[in-house]
Amino acid sequence: MARKTPIERYRNIGIMAHIDAGKTTTTERILFYTGVSHKIGEVHDGGATMDWMEQEQERGITITSAATTTHWSGMAQQFPEHRINIIDTPGHVDFTIEVERSLRVLDGAVTCFCSVSGVEPQSETVWRQADKYGVPRMGFVNKMDRAGANFLNVNQMVIDRLGALPVPMQLPIGAEETFRGVVDLVKMKAIYWEEENMGMKYTYEDIPEDMVELCEEWREKMVESAAEANEELMDKYLEEGDLSEEEIKAGIRQRCIDVEIVPMFCGSAFKNKGVQALLDAVIEYMPAPSDVPAIQGELEDGTKAERHSTDDEPFAALAFKVMTDPYVGTLTFFRVYSGVLSAGSPVYNSVKSKRERVGRILQMHSNSREEIKEVRAGEIACAVGLKDTTTGDTLCDPDNKIILERMEFPEPVISIAIEPKTKADQEKMGIALQKLAAEDPSFRVKTDEETNQTIISGMGELHLDIIVDRMKREFNVEANIGAPQVSYRETIKKSVEADGKFVRQSGGRGQYGHVVFKISPREAGSGFEFINSIVGGAVPREYIGAVEKGAQQQLENGVIAGFPMVDVSVELIDGSYHDVDSNEMAFSVAAGMGIKNGVTQASPVILEPVMAVEVTTPEEYMGDIIGDLNRRRGMVSSMDDIASGKSIKAEVPLSEMFGYSNQMRSLTQGRANYSMTFLKYNDAPSNIQEEIIAKAQKGE
């Protein structure tokens, strides 16, 4: 079966933004204008089709990235039909993992900014993630009808806060309640959308007289940006002082795809203005799968390889989301980078080294689905029947194995103990947590060996609240949760030599293992390193693996307070063995003893997670907010003026941030907002370390 739409006409885009920049409403309007959803769903009344999990509708925030396929031929039907796959991404800071994994499989992104608050803290976080994956972006300044709306102000913030180069492609006509339409700077025409038919109809008119000069000034800047794309355009621009419409679009497209500029658009999704022109811009300026560099991977023998976006290369895809569906079981969302996959055919999961069979392939529309026979390079689809595949795995042709670049997931920073309300639900809770952990790699489940409690860990309080909530809704398991626990770490400050000796003689065959280590601190974030410096066989080669494993296990279990020990180098420099009594277990135990002995002399310290906190507050509460942050051992790093008052940035230990949202609301009568992201691990002050160690020794 041949392709219906050539790959050049595909666009895989994400819509990313801070909470309340109107991202879900923008997506809804896109679905409406592309003819997929007939009644526009409003986030205000919990009806948006992209927000398809019940909690999202209640909380009015978007949690899971749903993938949707739509088609568009332009506002004036000026293009052949293009296929747009939209991945909706959450804007709440506890769900950055969702954003991270959707960015991984996108070719381009539309970033929504609020016309009043502009670049907010989460916009910066998401922007940095998009930089990491080299995703081309364009901006949509939404909510132009709100009091305080200012398009050019937001452009300036994109320069100042994100260090990017925005290029306005439109200017708004009016703002706040007088916002009526936009000026298209390429065509130099005003566009007005009719309110009666929800913006389905529009008119092109002359630019209002009082705006002509401003539009000419900004058009000049836009043409100049386009000319910088290549020498040919620059020569023509220098000779003639202008470029044709086609040349402007070609130049802007090239620079946008090369991540040099951010074309900027504006509108009000809620008032049905500007979204249709934004869709045209997606087709004109966002890359097709064939425009982005080939994806890199590794073959079985470790050699580097790449896969191009074409049906002729072997099949290779990345699973970027796993979900449990009550009717069909496990759904695996995947992006195909090369080749073709037919329903019912076998695939190879090269990360898990397992063959699997794809039962059915579904094309997803945010909450309805259509079954398809095959899926081709550049497409995003959903597989039913994959049992062992989790987020970030590569699926490929069993005869042409490859591992695509892996996704990186952050370590959780907060843990809570959880137990079912009734003993009968114990098994059900285990199954539910296992399924939720398969869906979300930033959520972990483990059993505490000493207390036998189930511990769940995640990226923030809201993240874990929603997990508990989903267990109740989707799996009918009600749970009690304990107080949140911080994920501390341990490390050392100086190098020492230490030995570990395990000898047991109790009649018959004994046990004997003896190692000498040099234990040294490493740079923050560099992890564990094991060096084997044995010469002359003081420890036989077959036991080296057991020594490394024993050392690593002891470090993971911690030494001073039971927290994982990080950034340590362990060098095996000497040891001894017994011809009869030595075995792997004895050396593993000896290694653990060596680590314990060494660490206690190596100035061990406890590290605590420190969060980057940003509070936006009306000016009159600034003193109270700063005072409260100082009481929480916070270090205020900056205070900036913003449209709604002040923005305060601070670094605060996570252990001091529990219950912060309630305290902040009471200090500011609910008028302040904050966001919090993990920043780094720092040495905890000595009094705090003593408390933590005392608690650990009591077994609390």
Swiss-Prot record:
Highest taxon, organism lineage: Bacteria
Gene Ontology MF annotations: GTP binding; GTPase activity; guanosine tetraphosphate binding; translation elongation factor activity
Principal location listed in the UniProt entry: cytoplasm
Protein name: Elongation factor G
Record keywords: Cytoplasm, Elongation factor, GTP-binding, Nucleotide-binding, Protein biosynthesis
Keyword Protein biosynthesis listed: yes
Residues annotated to bind GTP: 17-24, 88-92, 142-145
Intracellular or extracellular location(s): Cytoplasm
Pfam family, one: EFG_IV
Gene Ontology biological process: ribosome disassembly
Domain called tr-type G: residue spans: 8-290
PROSITE patterns per record: G_TR_1, G_TR_2
Function: Catalyzes the GTP-dependent ribosomal translocation step during translation elongation. During this step, the ribosome changes from the pre-translocational (PRE) to the post-translocational (POST) state as the newly formed A-site-bound peptidyl-tRNA and P-site-bound deacylated tRNA move to the P and E sites, respectively. Catalyzes the coordinated movement of the two tRNA molecules, the mRNA and conformational changes in the ribosome.
NCBIfam families noted in UniProt: EF-G, PRK12740.1-5, small_GTP
Cellular component, GO annotation: cytoplasm
Family, as annotated: Belongs to the TRAFAC class translation factor GTPase superfamily. Classic translation factor GTPase family. EF-G/EF-2 subfamily.
